[in-house]
A protein has these predicted regions:
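Residues in the recognition helix of alpha-helical DNA-binding motifs
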Residues: 273
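Structured, helix-rich domain cores that form ligand/interaction pockets
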Residues: 1-268, 276-346
Length: 346
């Protein structure tokens, strides 16, 4: 019978983007990675989807850069992270949590662009195999958020991988037999490698950044936090009515508390302007102006200027923001008034 004590969770990919105006390669290497800058070798290097043309690398730890990009990109693959844990973090009694906490607590102008988090099942009889879950998917008895897309790669001989959600989605789940993968890679029989089923969550862009942020805020270990996220997002069922959760998946997730990641939406242009006016612009002057007017402390020409504020017209971009706000609050009746007060270009 599968037991939770034979599960472990590790990061299998971490990719972080740093703004050039706030960071230097030396600072990334020495203050964030806790490494010696002289260990890194400079070489040519490129990264898909970006215009980097150079890299600094130490083993598989890589920092990409280039004159056409305004950032540096730290990429740590599974091999790089295994090396980093064994050779840098563990000898210094540090963890990946402390490494990331140092980054989030002490720095700004960076973003996590991708993380892969693996849950490894080393049970002699695993909670499930990729093929078992594939049969559930083929019957359309699963849902991942709002998606029911799945795909597979390989077979049971070389190792089968089950993918949930599309390749271009910001999050994806992979379930595969790590033992078969390693046996194939090493050219040895699988009987020489322990049983090993890997469930791997891949998050990109804002989802990756906010997942790490919420995990650091919590007091939950990576295994249970990741299981909690999967409990909230991914469901398998043993019946076509979606009324009976698949027992093996439920047991795998155990008593983990469901985790929901809320991504803050960027402020609209109107919100940014109002915030700037209040805290960095002329908000205090407007308040003073009103105080002087209400208490009859203005000269006549100043009164005329104050009253003229009500007759000012909106620049087109500001008017556009006002119309969007009126629609948001279901006050479409105000749109004609806004349009009547748009400043016309000469």
């Amino acid at each position: 019978m599968a037991k939770n004590e034979h599960l472990r969770s590790v990061f299998d990919w971490i990719q972080i983007q740093f703004d050039k105006t706030e960071f230097s390669p030396k600072e990334i290497i020495e203050d964030i990675l806790f490494l010696d800058f002289d260990l890194f070798i400079e070489n040519k290097g490129s990264l898909k989807y970006y215009n980097y043309d150079s890299q600094l690398h130490y083993g598989n730890i890589r920092i990409y850069y280039g004159s056409k990009e305004s950032s540096y990109m730290l990429v740590m693959s599974g091999q790089a992270l295994e090396f980093y844990r064994d050779m840098i973090l563990d000898p210094n009694s540090l963890s990946e949590r402390q490494f990331l906490d140092n980054l989030y607590y002490n720095y700004n102008r960076f973003s996590i662009r991708r993380i892969d988090i693996a849950i490894d099942d080393f049970n002699e009889t695993p909670y499930f195999t990729p093929n078992q879950l594939l049969k559930i998917c083929q019957k359309k008895r699963f849902i991942y958020g709002k998606s029911t897309y799945y795909n597979t790669y390989g077979d049971e001989t070389i190792g089968q991988t089950l993918y949930l959600r599309k390749p271009n989605d910001d999050e994806r789940l992979r379930i595969y037999d790590k033992r078969l993968e390693r046996a194939e890679k090493l050219g040895i029989s699988k009987r020489y490698i322990e049983n090993w089923i890997r469930t791997e969550l891949e998050l990109r862009k804002e989802k990756a950044h906010y997942f790490i942020q919420e995990w650091l805020y919590s007091e939950i270990d990576l295994l249970n936090f990741t299981k909690g996220y999967l409990k909230e997002k991914v469901r398998f069922y043993s019946d076509s009515h979606f009324s009976k959760p698949l027992r093996s998946w439920e047991k795998f997730l155990g008593h983990s508390k469901p985790v929901s990641i809320i991504i803050s939406k960027p402020k609209t242009e109107l919100e940014q302007k109002l915030e700037w006016f209040t805290y960095k612009g002329s908000g205090a002057i407007l308040k003073a102006y009103k105080f002087l007017y209400d208490n009859n402390l203005l000269h006549e020409y100043e009164k005329a200027n104050y009253l003229a504020l009500n007759n000012m017209e909106y620049p087109p971009d500001l008017a556009s923001g006002l119309i969007e706000r009126a629609i948001l609050f279901k006050r479409e009746d105000l749109i004609p008034t806004i349009k009547e007060n748009i400043k016309r270009r000469n």
